[in-house]
Amino acid sequence: MGDWRTISLPESDKILQYSSEIRMSPTSLLSSPSHSAANTLSGIVYNFCTEDNIEQCITYIDQELRTIGFPTVQAVSKNGDGRKLHLVSIVNCIHELLQRNSQNMRSKEEVETQLLKINGDLEHLQSIYQRQKDQMEATRRENCALQERDRQMQCKNRNLLQLLKNEKEEVQKLQNIIASRSTQFNHSVKRKEREYNKLKERLYQLVMDKRDKKISIDVLNYVGRADGKRTSWRTGKTDAKNEEEMYKVLLNDYEQRQKQLMVENAELKKVLQQMKKEMISILSQRKTKEKLDDSIGPVASDIEEDLADSSKENLSELSCEAVREQLVSSIRQQWRILKSHMEKLDNQATPDENGMIARGDHEQELGKLINEIQQCKETIKIQQQLLKQQFSVPRDDTSTLLQDCYLLEDKERLQEEWKLFNEQKKNFEKERRNFTEAAIRLGHEKKAFEEDRAAWLKHQFLNMTVFTDHKNSEEKRAHGVHFSPEQDHCRLHSRTHDRHLASSGDHYQRPRKTLPITPSSKHSLTQRESVAWRDSSISPNGTDF
């Protein structure tokens, strides 16, 4: 009996043999078992059976075949001397073994073919999995972009709703102002109608009183007409006709006079309202333009309503001279308030010695810069966290190559972002320097503008001719000098024109500093133009301010 011997192979040899067998084609598999079997059989023949132990080998093979289920290969000899080999049994056993070997080889080939199919399916599934993973990543990025776009659209929608709400409020305010103005206009029309009726009745009374108290001298020797025609006889009909014509002429004259007075009154009211609005805008301490526009409307409407109420109460009882005096006194009061306020501004018009930018603007700009730096820091922290998460995730054998590719792409993209960040940082530093220079230049411009404004206001208030013109008008009125509406209107326009020329000449003669045009300088120019237009405004009594 021979001993069983087991051959132990290293794990690397097994793996190489397994991998080589997997990658072999079925045709090579069909040919390879025969060669390997031949090699192994030749080794077993030379190692297992020799001439010395042939009997023992035959006995061992017979026992093994019987244990497997084959018939014995030895038969008893007829002589009874011993056992001999039975060739038929040996051939049958060999044939059966060959059949089983061929079946095992076919089953092995089938298993190997199935293994190849399974490996191919596995690779296909891995490729599908990787493609689905890439699609999922792209879908996730697209979803994030859509969410960001949705958020921006919602913010824009909220801003538009807020603007719509503000516009509706403005429309409501304007509608209320229009309604109040319409009611004031209706009241003024009714008041004018009542005044017209009263003046008509008073005119009729004056004419009738003069007719009753008329003292005349009859002409005995009447001089003939220049054309040589005879004069008509004076009868009751001719007298009535002449009186009617006289009344018609008087009524036409009074109507024309009333129309002219109404036109002049409307113009003077417009000038007065404009002056009051400008006074209120100057006297108000609001800083921003929106607040100023919102505050001028209600305050001016209140003042106009007060003035309209006072004029409604006193206009029917006072004459034109009294109304003019009342308007002049109100304008004087407003100008006194304006003068005191301008003197205060003149005292406060001295700017800082350094002429630097205001502290509030500087702090606001610093706050913006700090917010931008904080956002950059947060972005860098988020990127670092993402990089740590990517490095901390355990790598599988299948995803190592893909992770390396992703890391290379992320590294390149990060380098590009760093380059862009450095460029933005340089641009930001450049803009910061430009802003500092512009702030310094703006401080100098503001200082120069305040000096010019203080000097100009001082010159204007020192050369005011409101009270002197008013005294001259009172002296002329005391001496009985009266002007017709046409003469008053011409005098008004001539003084307006002269005053406008004088003020424009003063502006042109005064030296100015040439500075670069900035938003603040544009605002200062608009303020100067508005002040010059206010100087060319005219008071109701014919004097200019």
From Swiss-Prot:
- RNA-binding: is it a keyword of this entry? no
Which cysteine pairs make disulfide bonds? none
The domain of life is Eukaryota
Q: Which residues form a coiled coil?
A: 106-287, 358-442
Cited function: Belongs to an adhesion system, which plays a role in the organization of homotypic, interneuronal and heterotypic cell-cell adherens junctions (AJs). Involved in cell movement. Acts as a centrosome maturation factor, probably by maintaining the integrity of the pericentriolar material and proper microtubule nucleation at mitotic spindle poles. The function seems to implicate at least in part WRAP73; the SSX2IP:WRAP73 complex is proposed to act as regulator of spindle anchoring at the mitotic centrosome.
Family membership: Belongs to the ADIP family.
| Protein name, as recorded | Afadin- and alpha-actinin-binding protein B
